[in-house]
């Protein structure tokens, strides 16, 4: 075999007309050419190679007129390969390739045969890659009619979608393509194959972006997509959400604004009703992107919907989803949500107060609690986001209903208790340690209306739970530590007398007995009351191997030992808190605990 100056072999194919050579020889030569091209054996930088390839263009074109199916199949593959070469001869040969390939399809009359499948793939490559490859309108109509029955045939979908993508990419416009795209939209939803759904979404998105869409036509498409966000099968819903995500990202803002209301309501219903976590997450992400793409006026329209839903007292599910959307808004807009922040906080406060009303009913129905906890949990979660973005909201007097938050510390559902404790922890982290005023906090204080002793008592009650989670236990310890530091800052008239051993032994048997007497005795010393309260729980906590109460006491002792200089006490050598409990209690419980943790 001859070679180029660089030493690379050159492949010669001799054709003197398809009627003069045996068909098998012609098919073999075409197959040899296709194999050489597939293995990159042609050096396009070599003028000699290009000159020889130039002479092959009309020869390959002649094979498209062969009557033998094997020769025709190899010739179609060769035409697909040769158009990728930088050859001048292709300028006049490409239209011939296109016309003859369409004639082959017309002669066959269906897409079932191997030759027809190869012809479709070849035509798709030529139309896609060559700008001078034109398709007449009547031929385009014929192709679309030929493709329609095979859109859902698994064995032929690859070639069908290949030619369809090529047609859409070249923006060939005939009325029939709009009808075909309606079919593609349906297949995108109903087909169970992820690969087919991806092909449909790709073609449909390109069609929506590049083709003229009248308002009526586009609205019909958007309504179809919005409706099918509630399709019966998860795969179909996810396919629709994938396309909606691309639409919201790539459409012009003016178009998104026109259909924002329609899409927003559909997506919110997905969050409210869909049993698939993936669908709900995708809908939330699309809503987030939707808020970012909209102008102020359209954004305000959506917020008005959310406010309306948040005010639905009798429909807790609608209230819940409204609160969730507020959280999505915060995630999307961050500091740009300030315009809507006052109304948002009003809605959240209103629903917290409603929840308090439910809790204070004398005969509460458990099913009501079950339906209410999600609303409250999401409210506290959203308020946590608000405080992270706008810290002044937490410390501004009478902005948030903190008293209502405290009322939920003993809510029947653990998630709500956790969210309420975490929210209080955020508040405490922003406030300096200060002595609680005896007459209560003023209306100008962030803690207005709150009673630290009441909060501490609720936290202590939570610590008794056998189902206390480590996360909630840690948050309670943090909150009690802040409250304890505030109590430590309080001035006391003198040390509290220790409890006698007899009373202490009684308390060990029944920790709740005598609490009222201790509270009365410790009314001027809240820290003593708190230590007494926790000391009753430490013994049972050790037995149950729940260490939150012990951790809390340990932190108090270490804090007092390290920072309360006026006491001038040393942990481990003497009782630093002689007025908190008896010396026996210090020696048997607190001293070993503090020495262990210090």
Predicted regions and their residues:
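Alpha-solenoid helical repeat scaffolds
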Residues: 39, 43, 84-89, 129-130, ...
